[in-house]
């Protein structure tokens, strides 16, 4: 099976057909209703206006007045794999994120982005980075950091999630890939596969637990790549025939726009081909991945790619990064080039709005804390004044009494 995919990869490379193949997938993807995401009360729960969960596959929050969260359940029955693909939490949705993790009985969260990329906030800081716990009063949860294992390109956190109302606690593994550029690909399949198998070894992807929560910024590009590669490798381990294009089309029925660029599609093939060596019984392959990935070196900086490509999620355009299109009919390429600049500006504006909104919320929190302190002072001020006055009288009386009898 891996030989078939390898031949397909070589043909696509030789014929420079990654762009056309990607466009085929994009154009053949179905569009499904996503009305709930567009409700007025849910607008501030979406990081991007054009990335929404379908109504039929969206994850619903339980025991809340509003059950909406921008997250989709991707269920691949033949591989016995279920993933929750979601956007990077916003400041106002971190509480909903942890509620979802609890209700879905998730064992691990896989994070494939940095909180800030290219000076834009891509994700709120929803987990603690020190000994101080984070409390989410809106949904009644707290999160503590138990341990942290930092590698050169990923970090594993062990978190304690507590239901404040019941006192019940659960341990959640947080796998954070720190060097995967937005709209780009990891430096090598070896580093990615080493990370993927690290996640697998935790057991969090098996049907014995609730679905793993996987997110990047929008929950479609990097998250889609991770899910596609893992699913293909599972099917190959089972001896099943794997049609990568068809599998991706099936996964796109659950969440729009999975895999955002031809480069991500090409990288998925590379990772599947390399990962298949392990399924064939090459026991030393994981050791080679670890050596090639150099995970034990000091953490390195994120290498962002300054490229833009126009993406269309099942018929709806969204902003991407600059990348010239090749191998397309001239009319299609001209249309893409004409609209790429305006689409990029739109994505940048949305990122700036999200950043501004986060800063405004932080300012409001500081103002609220200042106001609470002021009210506490106004409450105690007259009491303390009276106590001081009474103390002065008592001291005066004591002094007078002492002088009188001496």
UniProtKB/Swiss-Prot annotation:
Keywords: Cell membrane, Cytoplasm, Endoplasmic reticulum, Hydrolase, Membrane, Nucleus, Phosphoprotein, Protein phosphatase, S-nitrosylation. The active site is at 216 (phosphocysteine intermediate). It comes from Mus musculus. Substrate binds at residues 182, 216-222, 260. This is Tyrosine-protein phosphatase non-receptor type 2. Ubiquitously expressed. The highest expression levels were found in ovary, testis, thymus and kidney. Disulfide bonds: none annotated. Signal peptide: none annotated. It is an enzyme of class 3 (hydrolase). Its EC number is 3.1.3.48. Non-receptor type tyrosine-specific phosphatase that dephosphorylates receptor protein tyrosine kinases including INSR, EGFR, CSF1R, PDGFR. Also dephosphorylates non-receptor protein tyrosine kinases like JAK1, JAK2, JAK3, Src family kinases, STAT1, STAT3 and STAT6 either in the nucleus or the cytoplasm. Negatively regulates numerous signaling pathways and biological processes like hematopoiesis, inflammatory response, cell proliferation and differentiation, and glucose homeostasis. Plays a multifaceted and important role in the development of the immune system. Disruption phenotype: Newborn mice are viable and do not display physical abnormalities. However, by 3 to 5 weeks of age they develop hunched posture, diarrhea and anemia. They do not survive beyond 5 weeks of age due to severe anemia, hematopoietic defects and the development of progressive systemic inflammatory disease. They display splenomegaly, lymphadenopathy and thymic atrophy, associated with altered B-cell differentiation, altered erythropoiesis, and impaired T- and B-cell functions. PROSITE patterns: TYR_PHOSPHATASE_1 (PS00383), TYR_PHOSPHATASE_2 (PS50056), TYR_PHOSPHATASE_PTP (PS50055). SUPFAM superfamilies: (Phosphotyrosine protein) phosphatases II. GO terms for molecular function: integrin binding; protein tyrosine phosphatase activity; receptor tyrosine kinase binding; STAT family protein binding; syntaxin binding. It catalyses: O-phospho-L-tyrosyl-[protein] + H2O = L-tyrosyl-[protein] + phosphate. InterPro entries: NR_tyrosine_phosphatase, Prot-tyrosine_phosphatase-like, PTP_cat, Ptpn1/Ptpn2, Tyr_Pase_AS, Tyr_Pase_cat, Tyr_Pase_dom.
């Amino acid at each position: 099976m891996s030989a078939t995919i390898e031949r397909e990869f070589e043909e696509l490379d030789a014929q420079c057909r990654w762009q056309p193949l990607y466009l085929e997938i994009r154009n053949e993807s179905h569009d499904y209703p996503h009305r709930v995401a567009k409700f007025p009360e849910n607008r501030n729960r979406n990081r991007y206006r054009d990335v929404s969960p379908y109504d039929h596959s969206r994850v619903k929050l339980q025991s809340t007045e509003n059950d909406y969260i921008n997250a989709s359940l991707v269920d691949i029955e033949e591989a016995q794999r279920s993933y929750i693909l979601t956007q990077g939490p916003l400041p106002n949705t971190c509480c909903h994120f942890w509620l979802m993790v609890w209700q879905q009985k998730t064992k691990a969260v896989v994070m494939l982005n940095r909180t800030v990329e290219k000076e834009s906030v891509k994700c709120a800081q929803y987990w603690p980075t020190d000994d101080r716990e984070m409390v989410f009063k809106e949904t009644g949860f707290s999160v503590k950091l138990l341990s942290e294992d930092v590698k050169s390109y990923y970090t594993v956190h062990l978190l304690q999630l507590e239901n404040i109302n019941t006192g019940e606690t659960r341990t959640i593994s947080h796998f954070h890939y720190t060097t995967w550029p937005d709209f780009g690909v990891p430096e090598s399949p070896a580093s990615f596969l080493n990370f993927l198998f690290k996640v697998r070894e935790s057991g969090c992807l098996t049907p014995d637990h609730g679905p793993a929560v996987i997110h990047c910024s929008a929950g479609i590009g990097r998250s889609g790549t991770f899910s596609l590669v893992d699913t293909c490798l599972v099917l190959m381990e089972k001896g099943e025939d794997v049609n990568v294009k068809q599998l991706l089309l099936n996964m796109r029925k659950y969440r729009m726009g999975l895999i955002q660029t031809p480069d991500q599609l090409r990288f998925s093939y590379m990772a599947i081909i390399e990962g298949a060596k392990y399924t064939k019984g090459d026991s030393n392959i994981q050791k080679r991945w670890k050596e090639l990935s150099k995970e034990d070196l000091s953490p390195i900086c994120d290498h962002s790619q300054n490229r833009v490509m126009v993406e269309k999620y099942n018929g709806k355009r969204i902003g991407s990064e600059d990348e010239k299109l090749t191998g397309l009919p001239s009319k299609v390429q001209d249309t893409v080039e004409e609209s790429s600049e305006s689409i990029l500006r739109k994505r940048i504006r949305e990122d700036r709005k999200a950043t501004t909104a986060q800063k405004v919320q932080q300012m409001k929190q500081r103002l609220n804390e200042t106001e609470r302190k002021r009210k506490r002072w106004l409450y105690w001020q007259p009491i303390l004044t009276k106590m001081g006055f009474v103390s002065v009288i008592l001291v005066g009386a004591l002094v007078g009494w002492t002088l009188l009898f001496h």
